[in-house]
Amino acid sequence: MLTEGISIQSYDGHTFGALVGSPAKAPAPVIVIAQEIFGVNAFMRETVSWLVDQGYAAVCPDLYARQAPGTALDPQDERQREQAYKLWQAFDMEAGVGDLEAAIRYARHQPYSNGKVGLVGYCLGGALAFLVAAKGYVDRAVGYYGVGLEKQLKKVPEVKHPALFHMGGQDHFVPAPSRQLITEGFGANPLLQVHWYEEAGHSFARTSSSGYVASAAALANERRLDFLAPLQSKKP
């Protein structure tokens, strides 16, 4: 079941909406979803529904609420892509991390929650997934094709919970020197895993993307499920 109209208060009093999906059987672990640059759009709704079908609750906060609340853009529309890039360029990453922390806190204390919370982020959200993991806010974090990870490597020692990252070998946002830095940097912390999908570029896991690579997406999603599975455990 998907629910809208949820309001969450952040660290500074700012409030934002969220899309929430609750599973048939509760309590369950909750996955907070950090959006791409296109807002809480059709792919985010698809991701919430998919996680619910796998037995998770899901919360997808509107991270653009500070700029343009309710943004839900179509990546296939050139004008909307331009709008997304402008929103991304103006996005406050520190505030985004704070808003995700508020969403995680909200998720952890809902009646449908078993108290365990993971995070899955894409693109912008993939970068936020790493920053949230470095803060220790979630039990497990997964990031897809996060942009700018090579600029955050000083935070690698701060990651205290398992985190998994899926990166496209052909991602134009991650040139070869950045790839090397990420691989070596993440290798310094055994809690961090990074998989490179050589045939894939950016947004390879978004089903509506012209860059969608079914084989890479299927493998990444399978690894994601295996990685998140411990959250289903009844053990503390």
From Swiss-Prot:
Q: In which pathway does it act?
A: Aromatic compound metabolism; 3-chlorocatechol degradation
UniProt keywords (A-Z) are: Aromatic hydrocarbons catabolism, Hydrolase, Plasmid, Serine esterase
Q: Which residues form the active site?
A: 123, 171, 202
Q: Does the keyword Hydrolase apply?
A: yes
- Please report the name of this protein according to its UniProt entry: Carboxymethylenebutenolidase
According to its UniProt entry, the protein's GO biological process terms are: catabolic process
Which species expresses this protein natively? Pseudomonas putida
| A GO molecular-function descriptor | carboxymethylenebutenolidase activity
EC number(s)?
A: 3.1.1.45
Q: Please give the family membership noted in the entry.
A: Belongs to the dienelactone hydrolase family.
Subunit structure, interactors included = Monomer.
